[in-house]
Amino acid sequence: MSSYNVPDLAPGEIHREEEVIRRSRFIVSMARVQGPDQAKAFIERIRVEHPDATHNCWAFQAGPAGSTAFAGCSDDGEPKGTAGRPMLTVLLHCGVGEIAAVVTRYFGGTLLGTGGGWFMPIKAW
């Protein structure tokens, strides 16, 4: 069983959580997706909702649980491998398939480092 709190989402439902970490505002948006096209459409929807965000990092696992056939991620300008890849790792190991997540960041003036774990305190995980 997963140690991550992944919500049980109905098709079309978006789950959101917000957290402030060292003055940066993070908004996690998650949704069920059926295939890469739906995942990309969801990611674009979140980008449009937050056009002035510093970053919209994302990851999706659009196939069955545990499959990497339809998976992808992006750091969206954060240092390479510090946001999208850790998010994808969480999605691949949470035991849930057909899910996409976007972490929207509004920079608060403090660099959080490149360890990739800065998002782990976010309640949606």
Where are the model-predicted features located?
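Glycine- and Gly-Pro-enriched alpha-helical subdomains that act as flexible
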Residues: 100-103, 110-125
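Contiguous hydrophobic segments
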Residues: 9, 92-96, 114, 122
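Solvent-exposed alpha-helical segments within well-ordered globular domains of core cellular machineries
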Residues: 37-44, 89, 119, 123
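Conserved interaction-surface patches within small, structured recognition/assembly domains
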Residues: 55, 74-110
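C-terminal regulatory domains involved in ligand/effector binding and gene-expression control
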Residues: 1-82
